[in-house]
């Protein structure tokens, strides 16, 4: 909602797809850099204080973004101040989703990345499916809400609502009793066994799921930007959020179904197959010339998206070392946001220069790269086993 809200607001007040994409990219870059830092701090100091602090800082940053964007529009300029505030809004975004996954892994007995004798894999798969579905609701229905509020009321309202939700809901998650399931690393009983150096170092294999999430984010961001340009030629940029929500509906349903899929295939094969299907369906984005046709394509395209996210998060939890789940989960989330920034920027620039058709090539490339990374993950996990 923050990225799409920034894209919509800045595009609306500046009249430039490139400016909107750049501002949305600044949000993504800030989040990409800030999320792992917040995750590492949560690993070391506990989730509650970090979540409470980030909720306050993010609310202030988002409100400052609204004021700065509208002030620059009145002055007829687009200064670096807008990008700086957008960066701050992204960097302070509370990492609720990734830290919720850490809590689930702890509650299902998988906090150290290994499965105990009771084999909680199905419970964990169910939890991660639920979290990915919740992510889809926010990633996709959030932009839909942006489109509704921006078109019916004002372009600044979605960001104001985001600030209100952050300051009211994030503290509730921060103080929820489940935060005790993930003790701070500095107080963890297992710290001595790892030595005085603190939490374990991150292995290089963590880069595979992180880069995969960068591809996912690039897919999301470029699709959003391309849809904005596509909708502008038919009904106005505000309708792009509603189109994007169609993909989210099928993606959320498919993510929720992953817990019931056969487990024989394994995570790597599931990753590769879903990514290949994503790439094939993304090519269809080049075909539509009307809103109903585009909606139908997006409905199909969403089917492999949710399962890929569930699978990559599961792989990330599997390769994460003890005491670093918060860092790894936030790194995966930051990969999505960084990719969204990259995709928004690339998609916005291509849409501005060559039209939506060129911008739709970016999600195709992102899905192909995602499939290749899945092949690499298959090799690595086979050796790990």
Regions found by a protein language model. Name each.
Residues 323-356:
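A late C-terminal transmembrane helix in Major Facilitator Superfamily
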Residues 1-32, 196, 200-245:
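Helix-loop boundary and gating motifs at the non-cytosolic
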Residues 85-137:
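Cytoplasmic helix-loop-helix junction between adjacent transmembrane helices
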């Amino acid at each position: 909602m923050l990225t799409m809200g920034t894209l919509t607001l800045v595009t609306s007040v500046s009249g430039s797809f490139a400016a909107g994409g750049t501002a949305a990219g600044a949000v993504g870059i800030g989040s990409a850099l800030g999320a792992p830092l917040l995750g590492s701090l949560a690993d070391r100091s506990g989730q509650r204080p970090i979540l409470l602090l980030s909720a306050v800082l993010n609310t202030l940053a988002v409100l400052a973004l609204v004021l700065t964007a509208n002030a620059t529009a009145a002055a007829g300029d687009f200064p670096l101040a807008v990008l700086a505030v957008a960066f701050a809004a992204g960097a302070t975004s509370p990492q609720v989703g990734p830290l919720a996954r850490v809590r689930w892994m702890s509650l299902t007995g998988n906090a150290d990345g290994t499965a105990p004798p009771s084999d909680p894999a199905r419970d964990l798969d169910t939890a991660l499916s639920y979290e990915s579905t919740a992510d889809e609701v926010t990633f996709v229905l959030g932009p839909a809400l942006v489109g509704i509020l921006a078109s019916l009321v004002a372009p600044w309202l979605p960001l104001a609502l985001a600030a209100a939700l952050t300051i009211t809901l994030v503290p509730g998650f921060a103080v929820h009793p489940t935060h005790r399931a993930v003790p701070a690393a500095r107080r963890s009983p297992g710290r001595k066994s790892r030595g005085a150096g603190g939490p374990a170092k991150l292995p290089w294999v963590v880069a595979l799921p992180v880069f995969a999430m960068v591809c996912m984010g690039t897919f999301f961001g470029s699709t959003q930007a391309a849809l904005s340009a596509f909708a502008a030629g038919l009904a106005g940029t505000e309708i792009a959020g509603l189109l994007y929500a169609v993909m989210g509906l099928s993606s959320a349903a498919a993510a929720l179904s992953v817990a019931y899929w056969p487990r024989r295939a394994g995570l790597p094969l599931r990753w590769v197959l879903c990514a290949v299907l994503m790439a094939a369906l993304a090519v269809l984005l080049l075909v539509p010339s009307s809103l109903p046709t585009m909606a139908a394509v997006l409905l199909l395209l969403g089917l492999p998206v949710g399962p890929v996210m569930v699978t990559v998060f599961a792989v990330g939890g599997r390769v994460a070392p003890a005491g670093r789940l918060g860092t790894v989960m936030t790194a995966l989330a930051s990969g999505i946001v960084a990719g969204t920034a990259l995709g928004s920027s690339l998609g916005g620039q291509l849409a501005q220069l060559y039209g939506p058709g060129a911008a739709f090539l970016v999600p195709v490339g992102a899905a192909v790269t995602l499939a290749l990374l899945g092949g690499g993950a298959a090799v690595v996990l086979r050796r790990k086993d």
